[in-house]
Amino acid sequence: MRDRIAFQFAASVALLLSLILPLTAHAFGGRPAPAPVAPRSAEAEYNKGLQAKAARNFPDAVNDFRRAVDIRPSFAEAWNELGFALRNTGQYAEALRAYEQALRLRPNYPEALEYMGEAYVKLGRLDEARTILERLQRLDVVRAQDLEGAIRTGR
């Protein structure tokens, strides 16, 4: 019991000193030590991208999702969202490359298939969009209907 109390006291003193010493150094003309900066995580960048996407700020979303896949190249969802953001900035060919990467990582990814099909529609490559549609119909009927509507209307 006494060891536990001593440990808690020592931990409290260490915490207090870690808070006070940088302030006293600054007060006496010294510079406070910079706080350690944790590297950005792929998830943090992905979440920033989702916020930018929700705000319809697709250029920022592109940058955020790119950072996410740079940090973690195996992040299929980030590749898919990167494709979505690229498509919404008119960069259809680059969007297709992002969707291809998402599908390499997760071959039966309905959302990536739908978005890829929509990018093909935007590029006027309707035969390729229909090929994607056939594959998507086996995986997700609702997304397949959305893609079918895009093919029909050319949007």
Where are these regions (language model features)?
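Conserved structural position within tetratricopeptide repeats
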Residues: V69-D70, E100-R104, Q137-R138
